[in-house]
């Protein structure tokens, strides 16, 4: 099992993406942050979590930013 702790803006959208495209993953923690975002922890198999991060969360980011966020995945 792997996990990642990330900030998001639209919880409902991410929740729907995970439910429909990545059912192996689960959101295990949700906290409002004071900076107009929501901090969530997503857990699941490493391969699925890596695919979610690459295809959904990091999509459209500069390569340096994507590399940073991909590096947040913990095993």
From Swiss-Prot:
Q: Which domain of life is it from?
A: Viruses
Any Pfam family hit? Phage_FRD3
Q: Which InterPro entries match?
A: Phage_T4_Frd3
Its recorded name reads: Uncharacterized 8.8 kDa protein in frd-Gp32 intergenic region
Q: Encoded by which gene?
A: y14E
